[in-house]
């Protein structure tokens, strides 16, 4: 049976955690409606029901480090969810990487695996349309394997973090679709499982989170299915 202990973070830690995710979402200058809806649902329904989304602000690396405390597992778990927020749409931009790097330094962490993720950075000056995280050539091996292993190390011990993962990662791979304007196709969006080579990894984390909520917390997980 699962022996995972349930450890809840304090409200101050969760507030700082959420503000950190907001900071990542704002990093590239585009706070999409999908990101707004996700953060709002996490705030109102899952993490801090009494907190108004509009009252939340971005957070500096120094303040984040102070609020999260000294526990290395807590700090690294936060950083994992911050990376998940950054790569959820299949694109890892330089502004997002900068925020993640600043958070990592302030938290006193040195995650070697993140260097492999930086090799996938999208450079808008070279491409008008994000092409997503690019898997390596076969001859290079899987350069993203280190970050996959690192993401897999997240501790799912707080139900609010587990709910975050379940909300963050869709239950099914989003279908490919065409974006049209005045009846003319302007861009084709491939399915997320092809766009983002880390998508399968995120799905695995989602399954672990569902299992934690159902088995350890005895929660009804049907809303996430």
Q: Model-derived features: where do they sit?
A:
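Small-residue-enriched hydrophobic alpha-helices in membranes
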Residues: 1-225
């Amino acid at each position: 049976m699962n022996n995972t202990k349930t450890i809840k973070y304090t409200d101050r830690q969760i507030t700082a955690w959420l503000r950190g995710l907001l900071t990542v979402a704002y990093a590239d200058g585009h706070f999409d409606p999908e990101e707004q809806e996700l953060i709002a649902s996490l705030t109102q329904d899952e993490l801090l029901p009494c907190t108004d989304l509009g009252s939340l602000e971005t957070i500096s690396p120094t303040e984040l480090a102070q609020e999260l405390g000294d526990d290395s597992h807590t700090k690294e778990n936060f950083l994992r969810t911050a990376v998940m927020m950054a790569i959820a749409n299949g694109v890892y931009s330089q502004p997002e990487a900068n925020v993640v790097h600043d958070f990592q330094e302030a938290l006193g962490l040195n995650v070697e695996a993140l260097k492999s993720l930086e090799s996938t950075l999208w450079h808008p000056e070279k491409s008008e349309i994000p092409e997503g995280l690019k898997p390596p050539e076969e001859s290079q091996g899987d350069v993203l394997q280190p970050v996959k292993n690192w993401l897999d190390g997240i501790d799912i011990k707080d139900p609010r973090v587990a709910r975050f993962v379940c909300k963050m990662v869709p239950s099914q791979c989003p279908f490919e679709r065409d974006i049209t304007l005045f009846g003319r196709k302007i861009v084709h969006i491939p399915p997320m499982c092809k766009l983002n080579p880390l998508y399968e990894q995120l799905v695995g984390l989602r399954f672990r989170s569902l299992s934690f909520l159902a088995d350890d917390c005895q929660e009804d997980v049907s809303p996430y299915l």
